[in-house]
UniProtKB/Swiss-Prot annotation:
Annotated region described as Disordered, given as residue ranges: 162-246
Modification comment: Phosphorylation of the C-terminal SVS motif by BMP type 1 receptor kinase activates SMAD1 by promoting dissociation from the receptor and trimerization with SMAD4. Phosphorylation by ERK2 MAP kinase in response to EGF or HGF prevents SMAD1 nuclear accumulation and transcriptional activity in response to BMP. Dephosphorylation, probably by PPM1A, induces its export from the nucleus to the cytoplasm. Dephosphorylation is inhibited by association with EGR1. Ubiquitinated by SMAD-specific E3 ubiquitin ligase SMURF1, leading to its degradation. Monoubiquitinated, leading to prevent DNA-binding. Deubiquitination by USP15 alleviates inhibition and promotes activation of TGF-beta target genes. Dephosphorylation, probably by PPM1A, induces its export from the nucleus to the cytoplasm. Phospho-SMAD1 is ubiquitinated by CHIP leading to disruption of the SMAD1-SMAD4 complex.
Organism lineage string: Eukaryota, Metazoa, Chordata, Craniata, Vertebrata
Residues annotated with Phosphoserine modification: S466, S468
GO biological process: anatomical structure morphogenesis; BMP signaling pathway; bone development; cardiac muscle cell proliferation; cardiac muscle hypertrophy in response to stress; cartilage development; cell differentiation; cell population proliferation
Domain (MH1) ranges: 12-136
Entry's free-text remark on domains: The MH2 domain mediates phosphorylation-dependent trimerization through L3 loop binding of phosphoserines in the adjacent subunit.
Region L3 loop: start-end pairs: 421-431
Protein name per Swiss-Prot or TrEMBL: Mothers against decapentaplegic homolog 1
Amino acid sequence: MNVTSLFSFTSPAVKRLLGWKQGDEEEKWAEKAVDALVKKLKKKKGAMEELEKALSCPGQPSNCVTIPRSLDGRLQVSHRKGLPHVIYCRVWRWPDLQSHHELKPLECCEFPFGSKQKEVCINPYHYKRVESPVLPPVLVPRHSEYNPQHSLLAQFRNLGQNEPHMPLNATFPDSFQQPHSHPFAQYPNSSYPNSPGSSSSTYPHSPTSSDPGSPFQMPADTPPPAYLPPEDPMAQDGSQPMDTNMTNMTAPTLPAEINRGDVQAVAYEEPKHWCSIVYYELNNRVGERFHASSTSVLVDGFTDPSNNKNRFCLGLLSNVNRNSTIENTRRHIGKGVHLYYVGGEVYAECLSDSSIFVQSRNCNYHHGFHPTTVCKIPSGCSLKIFNNQEFAQLLAQSVNHGFETEYELTKMCTIRMSFVKGWGAEYHRQDVTSTPCWIEIHLHGPLQWLDKVLTQMGSPHNPISSVS
């Protein structure tokens, strides 16, 4: 018997609860997490019994098992901080769980994490994992019924001319209103259909403020219902490898009335890599393209000799043209940004001590901002930057407005993000290519889906060219 085992003692209660642990990794961490929980639950009469009942009879109704909420909502276990309901759902249900964005409480839960109460329920069977929504196929007419004279290319020219010289700016969460609590409206000359978050018909110089809330208390928004054209209604909720949940999204069976010869159904397919990331310094691309094979990706300023496939380490990349401003900015990237792809939604969580700045047309559409608005995400906050279902709605609506309208959506499939230094109307840098360190994220699923739809639509009436 060695010295470590001589002095280590696991209580019978902890051993009992560890009997229901899922997965075989991180035994010591799980043991410490359960031990910390037992110490809290022993102070509450009946709490231990209720937890054991929930774990032993997962199909049966059970009561909330609560612990006090900490100031920042997180719990520290062995030098690692995490949200309590995520920690214990990982221990007893889903070892590959990465983020609170992947969880939603059941209706029976009285103390869900997002309710901001003094107590937090950690009963793992009071939460469910967010499922990837099934996206309806886009129905492309086989024969265009639109007059070439009515092409929307001229509107795109106008939109480009009307866009401000510099992008507008917004700060999360102060500038963000609740997206579904305002009437629909539309920006003038915008090529996108009505955005759900706009409450003004003019470009906002500074978006409307709202209750900022807490970054630790922001559950994922309930996805909007899937969209099909009005004449064809259809009724429609470590890291995880891409081929487990995401690739199960098969197209639903089409109703008889739209199984007809005059439309071609183009279904969404999940690609092998959900995104690729390219790193830039000013207007120079640096290093190779990073392909995300995991639904959880870290982009940080460190070096990682182990070549972890879930990390894009910018500290490894060299550039002979690097100046002192870039060098100083790189030193402040630190833990960088955590990108999650869960339930058909992409989230960016700022882990750096400095803010990150995001330009996502899908996010801007959702919140009713001008398409080119740059959103500041402070340290410790996370923001949804892309929603597959909203993109599906736009894709299905735009197909009836011609090739050029559909092609415009390619801009929505690329997200730009700068570290430490921002750009736009409130900063002296006007364009992202003027920022020292930035990345461009290409979303492969939406891009490939859009490409297939455009292929079915055929050539535009007025081909887009360098002089169009």
